[in-house]
Amino acid sequence: MATLKDQLIHNLLKEEQTPQNKITVVGVGAVGMACAISILMKDLADELALVDVIEDKLKGEMMDLQHGSLFLRTPKIVSGKDYNVTANSKLVIITAGARQQEGESRLNLVQRNVNIFKFIIPNVVKYSPNCKLLIVSNPVDILTYVAWKISGFPKNRVIGSGCNLDSARFRYLMGERLGVHPSSCHGWVLGEHGDSSVPVWSGMNVAGVSLKTLHPDLGTDKDKEQWKEVHKQVVESAYEVIKLKGYTSWAIGLSVADLAESIMKNLRRVHPVSTMIKGLYGIKDDVFLSVPCILGQNGISDLVKVTLTSEEEARLKKSADTLWGIQKELQF
């Protein structure tokens, strides 16, 4: 007896189902799921895989997304504790790990998360040896280094979300002050994602008009308008949101989808992301810090050489020294 499906549909070919634009998100906490929904709403993948160790939560999140399939254009959403569900991914986004507690610095999380990465990274590499790795877990600069070391991948394929969000926060606050949309407010926050990030005041502009030229005291202590406060707010913003709602999720999710778009569509847009910076700005150790990078299908293909003041360069170097101090003690 022919089934209803057989009566309705005449099959023409047996297809082998290898996804062309598969994205995996490892970790289905608040950040992982914000990344997932942001990616789904930008139609970046033909298959989305979710991985976590908590199986009930994982299955629930997968089902909840699948139930929205009518409103999405990602035909396949899968999940599993076993990394075989991640096979053939173009991009693997790591959000798993211990989360920052209220008042805890990102650097404090480090050894807890290194131990988690020792399990995750080899499994990702086993099933998607040609993928790009996008690291989001904190402290992101150190964990991007850890992922690079464990994976054995070339440095262009290991990317930290880095200061992409810090710069977005900076541009939002700049826009609020000026009454201009953030996309027309240009400004870069570089270096460590977190407390020692470096705002590049000389590069701040709207429509190519340098703010520093109009207002030479910009970013200095003698600035009557206290623009330094804008960067201070960027640094404090995550702590404030964590204090208020317990974690951050939406902005980092959107920021990660922005990076994923540049990679999946080979856009070659410039983003402040964490990359191996050894040999630049007098840095001699294997550290990852955010500088403006060109992002495309091979990950980071090039970086932009930003002209920094001696003070900015010194701050970058100090970040590098701090990170290396922690990295050289790590056990993995």
From Swiss-Prot:
The modification Phosphothreonine is found at T18, T309, T322. Pfam families: Ldh_1_C (PF02866), Ldh_1_N (PF00056). Belongs to the LDH/MDH superfamily. LDH family. The modification Phosphoserine is found at S310. It is found in: Cytoplasm. Its EC number is 1.1.1.27. Interconverts simultaneously and stereospecifically pyruvate and lactate with concomitant interconversion of NADH and NAD(+). This is L-lactate dehydrogenase A chain. One of its GO terms (cellular component) is cytoplasm. Pathway: Fermentation; pyruvate fermentation to lactate; (S)-lactate from pyruvate: step 1/1. Its main location: cytoplasm. There is a cross-link at K57 (Glycyl lysine isopeptide (Lys-Gly) (interchain with G-Cter in SUMO2)). The modification N6-acetyllysine is found at K5, K14, K57, K81, K118, K126, K224, K232, K243, K318. NAD(+) binds at residues 29-57, 99. GO terms for biological process: lactate metabolic process. ISGylated. PROSITE patterns: L_LDH. The active site is at H193. One of its GO terms (molecular function) is L-lactate dehydrogenase activity. The modification N-acetylalanine is found at A2. It comes from the Eukaryota. It catalyses: (S)-lactate + NAD(+) = pyruvate + NADH + H(+).
